[in-house]
From Swiss-Prot:
Source organism, top-level taxon: Bacteria
Documented EC number(s): 4.2.1.96
Protein name: Putative pterin-4-alpha-carbinolamine dehydratase
HAMAP family attached to this UniProt entry: Pterin_4_alpha
Source species: Halorhodospira halophila (strain DSM 244 / SL1)
PANTHER family in alphabetical order: PTERIN-4-ALPHA-CARBINOLAMINE DEHYDRATASE
MF terms in GO: 4-alpha-hydroxytetrahydrobiopterin dehydratase activity
């Protein structure tokens, strides 16, 4: 089953975050994303022609995030949007983060 076919499950905490090796294995499924130096977050910078296109993309990401009940941090500027994903309750990465990343990728930039 692909990540886009899965649904984020609520994380109640008390679960260990992925270690670097696990995260790198999951990253293969979302190759445009990068792992931060602490292996606690994944991120991707999307480029656009202008601010309006970037904002439109952010609004579509918001709809996916609400549907999955998993909310990324988003930086927005002229011609770009950077999406940063982690599971805050465990201060690291969980399968949910990669599911959301795959669904964001499916939106197209």
């Amino acid at each position: 089953m692909s990540l886009t076919d899965k649904t984020c499950v609520p994380c109640q905490g008390g679960v260990a975050p992925m270690d670097r090796q696990q995260a790198e294995q999951m990253l293969v499924q979302v190759p445009e994303w990068s792992l931060d130096t602490d292996a606690r977050m994944i991120y991707r910078r999307f480029k656009f022609r202008n601010f309006i296109d970037a904002l439109s993309f952010v609004n579509r990401v918001t709809e996916v995030a609400e549907a999955e009940d998993h909310h990324p941090d988003i930086l927005l500027g002229y011609g770009y949007a950077e999406v940063r994903i982690q599971t805050h309750k465990i201060e690291g990465l969980h399968e949910n983060d990669f599911i959301l990343a795959a669904k964001v990728d499916a939106l197209g930039a």
